[in-house]
Structure formats: C-alpha cells, structure tokens
C-alpha cells in the first residue's frame, strides 16, 4: 500500500504556479484572483483566508470582498459584473454556501465563464462534458493530477464515483470518462453499493459520511481516493473511508488530512494562472 501525499504534490504545483506567475508578471500581466465572501460563516472565512495566503505565497494578487450576510442578490451581481469588466482580474470566486435568500446557481452563472476558476459555470461544465478545454472544478482536477504524479493507470479501468455533487462527483465522473475509464456513479439511491464498489479498480468517495467506505467494499489492489473531511466528536478529522482497515487492501490511498485537501487550493491557483495566460494571449 502506498500513501498518496497530497501535501507534497500540492507544494510541487504551487512551485510551478510561482514560476509561471513570475513569468507573467515580467510580461506585464500580474495574475489576480478576486474572492467574494458573503456573511460570516467561520468555515468559509477559514477557506478564504487560506486561499488569500496561498495566492500571496505564489505571487498571485488577491482581492477580497467581504459582504454583509444581508447583502441583496442584486448588490452581489453588481459586484460580479464590475469584476467581469475589470481587465486586471483573471479569476472570480464566490465562496459557497451563500445565505438562503441568494440563488446560488443564478450567481454562478453571472461570473464570466472566462474568469470562472472554480469551473462551476454551465459553459465550463458543458466544455468538460464535451471533452473540450475549459476550467475544471478544483478538487477533481487535483485528483487527476495525483493520478498523473503517481503513474496510476486510468484507461480501461473500472472506476466508481460515490457521490454526484456538482463540485466533485459529476465532474470527477466526466474526467475519468474522458481518460477512458469505465465509470459508474453511485449516490444515496443506489442499491447494492458494495457489489458495485467490489469490482472497482478506482474508487473516489465524496459524500461527507465518516468512515463510510468499509474494507469489505473494496477489492485487493484498488486505488481509493477519499475526498471526505469529517470532524468527529473527539475533534479527530477523518475521511469517508474507514482508513485503518481499507488501507491494507489498497495499492494506493489518500489519507485525511493531507491527501486530496491540499490539492484543491493548488488547482485553484493553477486555474488562475491559466486565465492569466489567456489574458496575455488576448493582449498580444
């Protein structure tokens, strides 16, 4: 069993980003990410701060907009429109979840698809499904990078994605499909889940249920990618896989913490650089 070290790979990606940011800056394009936070959700604040810190460390300019929880939908849309029109901004990210009175989908559609570094805009989703180049959601994109770094073969393999969220499950399934895996997507209505997962060469579990994937659901030699981050009552962080028991059967597994998590912000930076490169092309 080999542990997939997301911290090490994310450090490698950040180093690439740092070099690319320096090259772009020399050419007069300073990569810039705008992050919008609505309300005072503690977890969201933590995420936004870590994104800001990562940008700074890699030479990406970051703009942070903190809005009151009672901000109107139209005021948020106005801010997004002004950032869409600002040529110096490469990426726009609205930290989710949003307060109840704001329609999340409507907001995500207002972000210019050329600045949608989270990859949530319908145009980018469509590009991913069609196998065209666009922005891909950061977590699945990071997982694909982990496969690449560890020379994990995807083509021709049976892959099972547990969870069908727009942020992880669906884009993950599309990326695996584009890489020629045979993909099954399972979810809360799936029957006989263990029967399906036992045939899988690759399992990506992303449902937010602690220790959900048990050893008897996994075949020997499988690759398990655990996207879950769950805090137990004793404050311990665990994933969606029962790590202690599942790990013994795997050829590769991501730990929690230190597996998939660090890759998410690294790929957000990578997407911001990609957008800045597109801006440079437009300027030429």
Swiss-Prot record:
Disulfide bonds: none
BP term (GO), one: methionine biosynthetic process
InterPro entries: Aminoacid_DH-like_N_sf (IPR046346), NAD(P)-bd_dom_sf (IPR036291), THF_DH/CycHdrlase (IPR000672), THF_DH/CycHdrlase_cat_dom (IPR020630), THF_DH/CycHdrlase_CS (IPR020867), THF_DH/CycHdrlase_NAD-bd_dom (IPR020631)
Pathway membership, UniProt: One-carbon metabolism; tetrahydrofolate interconversion
Record GO terms (molecular function): methenyltetrahydrofolate cyclohydrolase activity; methylenetetrahydrofolate dehydrogenase (NADP+) activity
Binding partners and assembly: Homodimer.
Function: Catalyzes the oxidation of 5,10-methylenetetrahydrofolate to 5,10-methenyltetrahydrofolate and then the hydrolysis of 5,10-methenyltetrahydrofolate to 10-formyltetrahydrofolate.
Keywords: Amino-acid biosynthesis, Histidine biosynthesis, Hydrolase, Methionine biosynthesis, Multifunctional enzyme, NADP, One-carbon metabolism, Oxidoreductase, Purine biosynthesis
NCBIfam families (alphabetical): PRK10792.1, PRK14186.1, PRK14191.1
Positions annotated to bind NADP(+): 163-165, 188, 229
Protein family membership: Belongs to the tetrahydrofolate dehydrogenase/cyclohydrolase family.
Tree of life domain: Bacteria
Catalyzed reaction equations: (6R)-5,10-methylene-5,6,7,8-tetrahydrofolate + NADP(+) = (6R)-5,10-methenyltetrahydrofolate + NADPH; (6R)-5,10-methenyltetrahydrofolate + H2O = (6R)-10-formyltetrahydrofolate + H(+)
GO CC list: cytosol
Classification via Gene3D superfamilies: Leucine Dehydrogenase, chain A, domain 1, NAD(P)-binding Rossmann-like Domain
Keyword Metal-binding among record annotations: no
EC number per UniProt: 1.5.1.5, 3.5.4.9
CDD domains in the cross-refs: NAD_bind_m-THF_DH_Cyclohyd
UniProt xrefs under Pfam families: THF_DHG_CYH, THF_DHG_CYH_C
Record protein name field: Bifunctional protein FolD
């Amino acid at each position: 069993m080999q542990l997939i070290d997301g911290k090490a790979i994310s450090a490698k990606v950040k180093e690439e980003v740092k070099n690319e940011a320096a090259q772009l800056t020399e050419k007069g394009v300073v990569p810039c990410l705008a992050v919008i936070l609505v309300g005072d959700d503690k977890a969201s604040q933590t995420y936004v701060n870590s994104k800001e810190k990562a940008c700074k460390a890699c030479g990406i300019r970051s703009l942070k907009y903190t809005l009151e929880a009672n901000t109107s939908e139209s005021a948020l849309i106005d801010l997004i429109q002004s950032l869409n029109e600002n040529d110096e901004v490469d990426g726009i990210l609205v930290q989710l979840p949003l307060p109840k009175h704001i329609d999340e989908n409507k907001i995500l559609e207002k972000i210019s698809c050329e600045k949608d570094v989270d990859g949530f805009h319908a145009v980018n989703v469509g590009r991913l499904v069609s196998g065209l180049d666009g922005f891909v959601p950061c977590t699945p994109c990071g997982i694909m990078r982990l496969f690449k770094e560890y020379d994990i073969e995807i083509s021709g393999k049976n892959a099972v994605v547990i969870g069908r969220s727009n942020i992880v499950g669906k884009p993950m399934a599309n990326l695996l499909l584009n890489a020629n895996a045979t993909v099954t997507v399972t979810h809360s209505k799936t029957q006989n889940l263990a029967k399906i997962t036992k045939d899988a060469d690759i399992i990506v579990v992303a449902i937010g249920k602690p220790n959900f994937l048990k050893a008897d659901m996994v075949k020997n030699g499988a690759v398990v990618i655990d996207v879950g981050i769950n805090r137990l009552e004793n404050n311990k962080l665990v994933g969606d896989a029962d790590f202690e028991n599942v790990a013994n059967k795997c050829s590769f597994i991501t730990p929690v913490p230190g597996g998939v998590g660090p890759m998410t912000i690294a790929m957000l930076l990578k997407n911001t650089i990609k957008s800045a490169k597109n801006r440079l092309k437009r300027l030429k």
